[in-house]
Amino acid sequence: MTTIEAVRNRILILCGERGITINRLATLSALPPSSIKNILYGKSENPKLITIKMICDGLDITLADFFDTVEFNTLEQELK
């Protein structure tokens, strides 16, 4: 799994747990829906940390909560 795949999966899992749509997440995060959709559908391969922070704020979680998962903790090194 790549880092961007882990980010996409985490957003989808968090939305699913809360029963919210991508559009609702965008509203809660004060982001345009296109920003989140670009991450989820592969148009944004390197989302900015501030965007992820705003998503976390909208979900009322910390960045640490967002990244503290098995997927992120077991990512392979990006440098090759």
Regions found by a protein language model. Name each.
Residues 1-20:
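A short, Lys/Arg-rich alpha-helix, primarily the initiator
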Residues 43-57:
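Short, basic-rich loop-to-helix N-cap that marks the start of a DNA-contacting helix
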Residues 15, 26, 56:
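The alpha-helix within a helix-turn-helix
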Residues 19-38:
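Short alpha-helical DNA-recognition segment
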Residues 12, 23, 53:
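Residues within the helices of the helix-turn-helix
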Residues 38, 67-80:
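Short, charged recognition helix plus adjacent turn
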Residues 14, 28, 39, 69:
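Residues in the recognition helix of alpha-helical DNA-binding motifs
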